[in-house]
A protein has these predicted regions:
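Positively charged, low-complexity intrinsically disordered leader regions
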Residues: 1-28
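Short beta-strand segments enriched in small/hydrophobic residues
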Residues: 31-39
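Glycine-rich phosphate/diphosphate-binding loop of Rossmann-like nucleotide-binding domains
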Residues: 38-52, 134-223, 227, 232, ...
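Short beta-strand elements in bilobed, periplasmic/extracellular small-molecule ligand-binding domains
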Residues: 55-69, 183-185
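Short, well-structured alpha-helical segments in soluble
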Residues: 75-87
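Anion-binding alpha/beta catalytic cores of soluble intermediary-metabolism enzymes, centered on
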Residues: 94-154
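Short glycine-rich anion-binding loops that position phosphate/pyrophosphate groups of nucleotides
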Residues: 95-101, 209-211, 230-232, 260-263
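Rossmann-fold NAD(P)-binding glycine/threonine-rich loop
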Residues: 105-121, 125, 228-281
Length: 284
C-alpha cells in the first residue's frame, strides 16, 4: 500500500477551508501566518512558496517577509519581537536554514510560544516531552496522521527511527512512544544499523542521504515512512532516503518521494496556524 500524502493533504485542506470560512462571522477575521525568509536559497524559496499557496487555498492570510542574508541577528530578533507584539499575527515561522552568522536556537526561542506554528520553541518541546498540551512539530504530526489513515496499528509495534534531529527524529520518536510503540532511535554512530532496521515493523527514515536504506535493510511487510528529500546523484530527480523501487515490493505500507510526507508537513502547518488562532480566541 502506498500512502499518498498529496491525496490526504487535499482532503484535510478542504476540511480546513470549510472551517476557516466560518471564522469571519465567528471571530471577525481569519488566521494570519507570517513567514520570514532570509536570503534566496532555492529550497527555502520553494518551501515558502508552497506554504503561501496552501494558506491561500485554506483561506488563511499569509504574509511573507523577505530579508537579505546580510541581515544581522539583532535585526532579525527585533523583527520577531515586533511580530510577537502584533495582535493581528497568529503564527510566526522563520524558514530554516539561516545564514551561519545567525543563531537558529536564539531565533526559535525568540518567537512567542503561542505563535510558534513550527512547534520548535523550547517550551513547546518541553511540553511535548511532558505530555502537555502544545503545538506539535509539523512533520512528525503529519507522519502519525498518515500511519493512522493507512490503518497501521502502532500500539505494541517495534518502531525504528533513523535520525535524531530536533525537527523530525526526536519528536516523531516521542509521538510513536505516546502511541505505545516500542521505539529505537538509530543514527550515524549506530553499530550494525541493518540488524537494527531489519527488526523494525515501522521504519521512519529522516537522515537526508539519497537511497541510503536498501532493500536488505528492511523486513518483509514493514511499514516504511521516508522523510528524506534529496536529489538522486545519478538521475538528478527527487528521491528519498530509501531505495523506493527496491523496497516498495517488500513493504506493506510505504510513502513515496515526492508526494508523501512533504505535502503533509505543509498541511499540518496550516492546522497549527488555525490551532494558534483558536487558542488566542479562547483566551480573549
Amino acid at each position: 500500500m502506498i500512502i499518498s500524502g498529496k491525496e490526504l493533504s487535499v482532503k484535510l485542506k478542504d476540511e480546513m477551508k470549510a472551517q476557516v470560512a466560518t471564522f469571519p462571522d465567528k471571530y471577525g477575521r481569519v488566521p494570519h501566518l507570517v513567514v520570514i525568509l532570509v536570503g534566496e536559497d532555492p529550497g527555502s524559496v520553494s518551501y515558502v512558496t508552497g506554504k503561501a499557496k496552501a494558506s491561500e487555498y485554506v483561506g488563511i492570510k499569509n504574509t511573507t517577509i523577505r530579508k537579505p542574508d546580510s541581515i544581522s541577528e539583532a535585526e532579525l530578533l527585533t523583527l520577531i519581537d515586533q511580530l510577537n507584539a502584533d495582535d493581528s499575527v497568529d503564527g510566526i515561522l522563520v524558514q530554516l536554514p539561516l545564514p551561519k552568522h545567525i543563531s537558529e536556537d536564539k531565533v526559535i526561542a525568540a518567537i512567542a510560544k503561542e505563535k510558534d506554528v513550527d512547534g520548535f520553541h523550547p517550551l513547546n518541546v518541553a511540553a511535548l516531552w511532558q505530555k502537555q498540551d502544545c503545538v506539535l512539530p509539523c512533520t512528525p504530526k503529519g507522519i502519525i496522521k498518515m500511519l493512522k489513515v493507512a490503518g497501521v496499528e502502532i500500539k505494541g509495534k517495534r518502531a525504528v527511527v533513523i535520525g535524531r534531529s530536533n525537527i523530525v527524529g526526536l519528536p516523531v520518536s516521542k509521538l510513536l512512544l505516546d502511541e505505545n510503540a516500542t521505539v529505537t532511535i538509530a543514527h550515524s554512530r549506530t553499530v550494525d544499523l541493518p540488524s537494527v532496521t531489519r527488526n523494525a515493523e515501522i521504519l521512519v527514515v529522516a537522515i537526508g542521504r539519497p537511497k541510503f536504506v536498501t532493500a536488505d535493510m528492511v523486513a518483509e511487510g514493514a511499514v516504511v515512512i521516508d522523510v528524506g528529500v534529496n536529489r538522486d546523484p545519478e538521475t538528478g530527480k527527487l528521491c528519498g532516503d530509501v531505495d523506493y523501487a527496491a523496497i516498495e515490493p517488500k513493504a506493506s505500507v510505504i510513502t513515496p518521494v515526492p508526494g508523501g510526507v512533504g505535502p503533509m508537513t505543509i498541511t499540518c502547518l496550516m492546522e497549527n496556524t488555525i490551532e494558534c488562532f483558536l487558542r488566542k480566541q479562547s483566551i480573549a
